[in-house]
Amino acid sequence: MGAGGRRMRGAPARLLLPLLPWLLLLLAPEARGAPGCPLSIRSCKCSGERPKGLSGGVPGPARRRVVCSGGDLPEPPEPGLLPNGTVTLLLSNNKITGLRNGSFLGLSLLEKLDLRNNIISTVQPGAFLGLGELKRLDLSNNRIGCLTSETFQGLPRLLRLNISGNIFSSLQPGVFDELPALKVVDLGTEFLTCDCHLRWLLPWAQNRSLQLSEHTLCAYPSALHAQALGSLQEAQLCCEGALELHTHHLIPSLRQVVFQGDRLPFQCSASYLGNDTRIRWYHNRAPVEGDEQAGILLAESLIHDCTFITSELTLSHIGVWASGEWECTVSMAQGNASKKVEIVVLETSASYCPAERVANNRGDFRWPRTLAGITAYQSCLQYPFTSVPLGGGAPGTRASRRCDRAGRWEPGDYSHCLYTNDITRVLYTFVLMPINASNALTLAHQLRVYTAEAASFSDMMDVVYVAQMIQKFLGYVDQIKELVEVMVDMASNLMLVDEHLLWLAQREDKACSRIVGALERIGGAALSPHAQHISVNARNVALEAYLIKPHSYVGLTCTAFQRREGGVPGTRPGSPGQNPPPEPEPPADQQLRFRCTTGRPNVSLSSFHIKNSVALASIQLPPSLFSSLPAALAPPVPPDCTLQLLVFRNGRLFHSHSNTSRPGAAGPGKRRGVATPVIFAGTSGCGVGNLTEPVAVSLRHWAEGAEPVAAWWSQEGPGEAGGWTSEGCQLRSSQPNVSALHCQHLGNVAVLMELSAFPREVGGAGAGLHPVVYPCTALLLLCLFATIITYILNHSSIRVSRKGWHMLLNLCFHIAMTSAVFAGGITLTNYQMVCQAVGITLHYSSLSTLLWMGVKARVLHKELTWRAPPPQEGDPALPTPSPMLRFYLIAGGIPLIICGITAAVNIHNYRDHSPYCWLVWRPSLGAFYIPVALILLITWIYFLCAGLRLRGPLAQNPKAGNSRASLEAGEELRGSTRLRGSGPLLSDSGSLLATGSARVGTPGPPEDGDSLYSPGVQLGALVTTHFLYLAMWACGALAVSQRWLPRVVCSCLYGVAASALGLFVFTHHCARRRDVRASWRACCPPASPAAPHAPPRALPAAAEDGSPVFGEGPPSLKSSPSGSSGHPLALGPCKLTNLQLAQSQVCEAGAAAGGEGEPEPAGTRGNLAHRHPNNVHHGRRAHKSRAKGHRAGEACGKNRLKALRGGAAGALELLSSESGSLHNSPTDSYLGSSRNSPGAGLQLEGEPMLTPSEGSDTSAAPLSEAGRAGQRRSASRDSLKGGGALEKESHRRSYPLNAASLNGAPKGGKYDDVTLMGAEVASGGCMKTGLWKSETTV
């Protein structure tokens, strides 16, 4: 039993021995590697796999399952490392990039291979060789783009193939030829393009009983998006329509702003759909080729994974030329697709477009400050509650506007924005709606409702859209007869639109020509054998159409009329230039109508036989209208022919592009408008040739005008705007309200006239004057303002009277105002308020200029004719001169009143429809031309009287005339030369006597004259200025009112007159005046300052340039460095002693020398008196000082009369007997004596000039007006004798002095004593006594 027991125990052990290896394999620890896998494959797991079909039992020893998923394998494991019995290999979720040839060679038992979710991009041919038993292959979610038939070699038993989720977009035919057992395939990708390139797949699948997975969905084109490929029909797989690419990128894709010299690369990537796929580059639509010298580097295109094509373009050195659009275009047989990017190249100094606000019919846009070369964008104003979706109103649409490289805004693009006006927006909706025979009549009735308010249209696009709709409705007239009446009503309503809007619509889209052309073709489209007559009446249009037989035609006469209540001729309905008020639909009896009769009856518009009606137009068609028919249309079987008549109440729908008639119709340079109704006659389908007899037309005028011309509307082509021409039309007769004409053409006929209220030409308004006007006006303004500024800045130094100063400045200012406003605003008719302001300003300035000339002529005439009686002792002083206010009230107030009344009555009197801004003709007669005629008459009378006065006794007897008028420059110089030889003391006596007799025989107030020009010269200058201004005004008026050659001639004459006027005013009043030239020189400082210890300057003799007879006044106190307190002394107006005379001369000479601060050059010697002769009492020019000086000179004249009667002795007695206190005299007394002192304040020739260290700080007192007038008087013979006696007395009392004479003057002369005294005064304040020892000072 023991032995048997042992045998029984050994039997199970023998049975377990064969299973021991399997148990060891299953129980082996994992630490030594994956279970059942070689130690070299650490990331894989191996396990046994039960064969299919076995429900239990032990797995077969040769079947292995190897799982290598998620192990980051870069490539499949070597087949030799895997178990020989491997039937399933899972390699998903790794990083395998490619499959080499023979990657799985040796795995002959492999039945399932899973390679999904890798990054496989290339599969080499033969990659699956050796897998003869493979039944399932999963290559989904990789990056495979190239698949060929060689790819799947060695898979004869493959049943299921999954290649979905890759990047291919199409498959080549025969790609599955190496898979004979294939039953199911899934090839859906995000780029799958179901087009003609996949058309082979559907029949191939049907023939092979291949099932396309339901997950195989189309991605492109968009029409088949998300549809299963297996459910499509073969016809749906086509390559028609726009090219759609699954990939098309351009880098950079957004606008780039770069600087000159930068480097910019471009890269373009697109779908590769075949060998014909190409990428081309364009710059501003021009092809781009590689050019290394120009900095353009273009690389060859590269193809990636048989799916993408890439091209690179590099700009290595960017210049300004690179600005614009750069475009990448993908081209193939199916079509082209492009991507663009804008490049803006900035210069080193880039400019900006200013911020600007634009308001138009699309909205209100505020464009910000934008860099030059940049296109700015603004969001459109959207209407979210718009019931009808518009193509241009989609969300996100924008308006664009480009700022050019010069920093100027270009016109913006607002086409993607909605209209702000409700009517325009609705009419635009009508245009976008599709029209067919079922809805045409409904849309037409709805559109007519909107056109009933055509008078309130405010946008030209309203007319454009209605015209487009009328053209669309014309195509359905043959089917819907009711459309004829609706179309005529809409055209009639559009004639109520403002004429300016009609003109703009015609210019924009030829809208008016479209409407007229549609109406002319209605008869031929609507008439048929069942409808042989059409008659439609409307407010402004009437239509009559007949279907006639040419062989039975005997002539036709039609008259267009209306009821008298609807439009009496005097009311002139619809005249151009006037906005008609909105009108409701008029009653039937107020509409235009036709009345036609056969034959040729006599019809007169003046005696129309229908009661309570007025005939507006008539046309008579001759019986021979169809006599020129071709033989094909001759009897015995005459075809039907359409004859249509139209009448338009006015010519609002007939606008040529320039709104003017052609030269043949109106003559050269004429502006004409339609003054009658327009009547049309035309045929359709008749082949009418040249007429053998003319068409007789009679038309009633609804507007006044001149020079009527018969014309017909010539339409050059279907798309042409057309225009009026008179070729073939002749005017037979013209009465005040009716014109008769004959025409050899069928068409639209009217009478053109020069209308008094011609509508303004919008396109030409503000276009400007002839170019010659502007530079000549600028020259005139330059001369006038130079004169004005000179006289204002140098008021005190220019020797003109107060009245003369005011009159000259006002005259220059008003001439400048007239010329400037004329040149700058006469053509600004586009802006109503500006045009009215220009007209009012021109009206005022023209009248005021002529009135100032008249005032100046009156003052000059008064100077020549009025003389005051010689004053006697005890006579009261003369009255103060009248103020200048009266002249301002006359020359400025009268024009202001006239212009104010004219504007208050009707402000529109200053805005006619003429092409310039001026008064309407009738109001201008009473408001301008008649006042101008009166002003000219009075002015010319003054001119004539003044001229006769100069040629009469005044010219023969100077003593009885205006003795105070100075001679001209040449005469003054000669007079000074004659007196210079009479000795130095002659000047003193002459000055005394001339001053004393200044009031004797004075012709007028002393301030009323000119110190340099004689009355004759002044009168000649005024007359010249007057007539040059009239010539300039007349030529300027003709230059804007005429056309063509007369306009050019008048513009040139205006330029000549304006230039001559400006140069004359400047030359006469500035350049030729010595005092003005001296003031100019005084404004320029000397080149180098005087030396600190310069030798004294010699004083010129008083008779050389500062002669008391012909000399100029002393320098002003402004030149003194001591200011207003520089001279504490004052001399009485009558107590002129020899001490005062000497001290006055020395002090003033010293002040003149010391006040300059530096010596003058020799060329300015003797011109010191030119500086500020009129500056009275410390630089103040007050009228009160003038009056005091006037009275002082009058009182001094009484004392000087004694010297005049007593000769030299009386003068000496007067000088030596009277005494006065220097310190106690009032200031006015000093002014009176200093103005009359001989040679006061002048440099004395031959004597040394005191240096600033030697002279005193006192200021020279200027001469008064009376003193200057007295110095300009000629010395009498007694004065000359007295001068000799005084000279002897001066030599007798002189002392021998040792003072050096720098200019070589002889010692012991006239002013030797004065020189000595001046040296003493330098230290004693002009109070040292040295010459007259008998003088006493109180």
From Swiss-Prot:
The modification Phosphoserine is found at S1107. Residues 34-771, 829-832, 908-924, 1041-1047 are extracellular. Residues 981-991, 1111-1126, 1264-1273 have a biased composition (Low complexity). Residues 1275-1292 have a biased composition (Basic and acidic residues). This is Adhesion G protein-coupled receptor A2. The gene is ADGRA2. A motif (PDZ-binding) lies at residues 1335-1338. Keywords: Angiogenesis, Cell membrane, Cell projection, Disulfide bond, G-protein coupled receptor, Glycoprotein, Immunoglobulin domain, Leucine-rich repeat, Membrane, Phosphoprotein, Receptor, Repeat, Signal, Transducer, Transmembrane, Transmembrane helix, Wnt signaling pathway. It comes from Homo sapiens (Human). PANTHER family: ADHESION G PROTEIN-COUPLED RECEPTOR A2 (PTHR45930:SF1), G-PROTEIN COUPLED RECEPTOR 124-LIKE PROTEIN (PTHR45930). It is found in: Cell membrane; Cell projection, Filopodium. Interacts with RECK; the interaction is direct. Interacts (via PDZ-binding motif) with DLG1 (via PDZ domains). The cleaved extracellular subunit interacts with the integrin heterodimer ITGAV:ITGB3. Coiled coil: none annotated. It holds the Pfam family 7tm_2. It comes from the Eukaryota. Endothelial receptor which functions together with RECK to enable brain endothelial cells to selectively respond to Wnt7 signals (WNT7A or WNT7B). Plays a key role in Wnt7-specific responses, such as endothelial cell sprouting and migration in the forebrain and neural tube, and establishment of the blood-brain barrier. Acts as a Wnt7-specific coactivator of canonical Wnt signaling: required to deliver RECK-bound Wnt7 to frizzled by assembling a higher-order RECK-ADGRA2-Fzd-LRP5-LRP6 complex. It is a multi-pass membrane protein. LRR repeats lie at residues 82-106, 107-130, 131-154, 156-178. The lineage of its organism: Eukaryota, Metazoa, Chordata, Craniata, Vertebrata. Residues 594-759 form the GAIN-B domain. Residues 793-807, 854-886, 946-1019, 1069-1338 are cytoplasmic. The leucine-rich repeats (LRRs) are important for potentiation of Wnt7 signaling. The RGD motif is involved in integrin ITGAV:ITGB3 binding. Residues 710-759 are annotated as: GPS. Glycans are attached at N84, N101, N162, N207, N275, N602, N690. One of its GO terms (molecular function) is G protein-coupled receptor activity. The keyword Signal applies. Its main location: membrane.
